[in-house]
UniProtKB/Swiss-Prot annotation:
Gene3D superfamilies linked: Ribosomal protein L28/L24
Pfam families associated with the record: Ribosomal_L28
Gene Ontology molecular-function annotations: structural constituent of ribosome
Name assigned to this protein: Large ribosomal subunit protein bL28
Region entry Disordered, spans: 1-24
Keyword Ribosomal protein tagged: yes
Keyword Acyltransferase: no
GO cellular component, one term: cytosolic large ribosomal subunit
Record key words, sorted: Ribonucleoprotein, Ribosomal protein
Protein family (similarity comment): Belongs to the bacterial ribosomal protein bL28 family.
Biological process (GO), any one: translation
InterPro entries per UniProt: Ribosomal_bL28, Ribosomal_bL28/bL31-like_sf, Ribosomal_bL28_bact-type, Ribosomal_bL28_sf
Amino acid sequence: MSRRCDLTGKGVLSGHTVSHSNHKTKRRFLPNLCNVTLESETLKRTIRLRVSANALKSVDHRGGLDAFLKKARDEELSPRALDFKRLIAKAAAEAASTAA
């Protein structure tokens, strides 16, 4: 399992730890990933994803998983999240056609 956020694509960065004497040693900056279960209102089911804490805040800010995926660019989403985005768009289109 890679250390990459399913929603934002945030991954591992590398850099230096700098001591008081300015001695630099290599280190890795790991993203704050959480295994979460988010609910899709359009699909009426839950979805398990591995997302960063920052992405979780963004999902809340945008008004839920469906709104986040609708607005997100395809390049930053994982293949699994992209599948859910397509399923949600398809279900929303079907719901709109049956309502009309």
